[in-house]
Amino acid sequence: EDWAIIIGGWDTLFFGNPLLQDRTFSMDVKGLFETVIKDSEIVHPEPYTQWEYYNQQCSLAEAFDKVINQTDDHSDLGKPNMYLCKAEEKGAANALASVKAKQNKDITIVVQPFGRSARVDNGDIVDDSSRSIEPHVYYKLVKKLSQKYNIIFMGEGEFAKEVEEEDSYSEKPQIPDIRAWAAIIEASDYFIGCDSMGQ
């Protein structure tokens, strides 16, 4: 079959995937309309609008499968894979070793408290879509978890800056690359997040 994936962002997540890498195109590729889009039937999957997904009755991968392949039988889906390179894996191992040396615990948890729609508004973190953990809840969570676990805060710089006064428990690395974050999440023991980026 001749098919392609056109993605508005995060196309680097597909790098290294033997099935998807050569079929994935960023929206800003010159000539994309003429070479790929013009003669194609377009399927615009939006898994977040699937009842089963937002009621936690199917995974994100199953929601995509339902929309793209028009099926409720997901038995043929394998485990999702991210193909990381050695440098990404080594970078994650080094980051975790640094966190473990500072926080001195055996188990590491990455916490992503704020979703994509969160923003800073006059010193407060707000999320109009209500998909983020409220800051006061996040502070209680990391305070409690930090008694037994190493904590890594996953979030953009403006959020790290806003939480640093109340959250002295977590490491707050500023990593703009989502593949590096994927490697850190994969190398960690647990992940707590409210946004599909981390999931």
Residue ranges and their predicted role:
Residues Y48-Q56, A118-I133:
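Short, flexible/disordered intra-domain loops and linkers
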Residues D124-Q199:
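Donor-binding and catalytic core of enzymes assembling or modifying cell-surface/extracellular glycoconjugates
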Residues E1, E41-P45, F114, A118-D124:
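A short, surface-exposed helix-loop junction/capping segment
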Residues A4, W10-F15, R119-V120, G157-E164:
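Short, charged/polar "capping" segments at the starts of alpha-helices
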Residues D2, N104-D106, K148:
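A general structural motif
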Residues E1-A61, A180-A183, Y190-G193, G198-Q199:
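Active-site and donor-binding regions of nucleotide-sugar-utilizing enzymes
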Residues Y48-G115:
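A nucleotide-sugar donor-handling region in carbohydrate enzymes
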Residues I5-I7, Q112-P113, I152-G155:
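Short beta-strand segments
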